[in-house]
Amino acid sequence: MNDDTSSSNDSRVSDQPAVKADEATVNSGPAKKVVAKAPRKKATAKKATAKKATAKKAVAKKATAKKASTKATAKKATTGKAAPKKAAAKRQAKPASALIVGAGFAGLGMAIRLKQAGVNDFVILERGDRVGGTWRDNTYPGAACDIPSNLYSYSFAPNPEWSRSFSGSNEILDYIHYLVDAFDLEKHIRFNCNVTDLSFQEKAGLWEATLEKGEVVRGRTAVMAQGPLSNASFPNIEGLEEFEGKKIHSARWDHDYDFTGKRVAVIGTGASGIQIVPELVKTVGTLKVFQRTPGWVVPRPDFKTPDWHKKLFKKIPASQKAVRQALFWTHETMAMAVIWNSPLTKVAERLSLAHLHSQVEDDWMRRQLTPDFRIGCKRVLVSNDYYPALQKDNAELITWPIARLAPNGIRTSDGVEHQLDCIVFATGFDVSKSGTPFPVKGLEGRRLDQEWQGGAQAYKSINVAGYPNLFLTFGPNSGPGHNSALVYMESQLDYAVKGILRILDGNLKMLDVKEDVQQRHNRRLQKRLAKTNWNSGCKSWYLTEDGFNATMFPGFATQYQRQMAQFEESDYQAVPA
């Protein structure tokens, strides 16, 4: 990265975004619905109090009977009959309205939307000791977003203080912390709570999350918001454990390691790799970049935000909204180039090749960096400084396949052993296309990881038949190939809130999408996906091993928004409590 961009990674948001928590809402419908139903909830509470009083009298009578009983009663108490009563008392503890797994963008966004809808008794289970999700974990040199900051943020919580058009990871993490403070979310978050099992209890109509330490947390609904980019992935290379030098994954960066003068390799030339290489080449002795497949790289129109922009955004919030809309529609246009094979696809490829030719002079290197697949088939990369970094005197691009790791380095298929002090794995994440990060159990012993062995499927990326009251974020086929993930996320959050309110306000035991509705939805999706660039023949993390696309949404962001705009109750089976 250039000097301006790298310095932005150390910057912090100096002022909080000019939006108040109670003003930050775009959809007041759910909130009004809850307020209107408040009297009914009070009446329900009174009934519950009366029931509790009756229950207490019954318990008192039983206690008196116990005191008056003889040895037979004592024997009865020691045979384990008291234990079920203890368990029953534990189950009577009021469950949360919603269990949210994960405190990254998705989990916090879900919490905000629930609060704005009048639901406050939810709990967020976070496995780490801080919020942030992928932006907490990815702190490698040069880490930044490849979507403009004014689009990679929530529309209901704009930040007029972005320092650059493309912000670094530190600044994005500051924005996430702002969300926690502005919407008073920290009291809802339980840190260091790693969920190991999520099971639906059909009789009670509750979800139970089992934590690593054995504790069970219960909720009427559950939201899986752990995100697809949370588990670091290492390549399946022979001898991985044999290398005696330092091994670092891009998502688990070791800031104590001194790269100065070291012999370093970077494996992986995807989104994280092209950000790491320009930073490491500045300090290492030698840098060897191991490339399996070149990607399409386009320029990044990055610039420092002028102070007058910030002042304008603060004084006239509508001006920032207009900028966001302009960015949104610009990216929507890109869909024609990267999702489908259209005349714009060829235009995009020519622009990318022009970028390559303008920055790389050597013919051999140009050929090695030219993709042989259609643009959009893999993730399009955005960088101004990756190509120049590869041409530094201490850098070398290696395209021979890796045969294995050796104790002192990497051995390639041409028989050369590259001596190294450190290997950086910029190999991305174990994206859950056919499984789940922990067992998720639904009705009648169903397990989501088993059902998704052939590829993940859901209804509108949110609900899965047989798993009532469960809502997914970044679920199957919700990935954008051209626009901001948070645009898609907002549609998911609002849809999930509608479902959760239907369960809570309707006093439902279960709300489960119909199996035939889900199957019909996915047949249509896969038919549309077959015509996209993602399914045009290259190997990418979008697809399973057998070519099933469980990741991307085959359309414009506006089409996804329309899909999520209506909650069709006829698509679900509702079971009253």
Tell me what each language-model feature is.
Residues 88-95, 99-105, 109-130, 224-359, ...:
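Rossmann-like dinucleotide-binding core of oxidoreductases
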Residues 3-5, 10-91:
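Intrinsically disordered, polybasic Lys/Arg-rich low-complexity tracts
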Residues 159-178, 190, 267, 339-347, ...:
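Short beta-strand to alpha-helix junction loop
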Residues 93-189, 291-294, 358-364:
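Beta1-alpha1 glycine-rich phosphate/pyrophosphate-binding loop at the start
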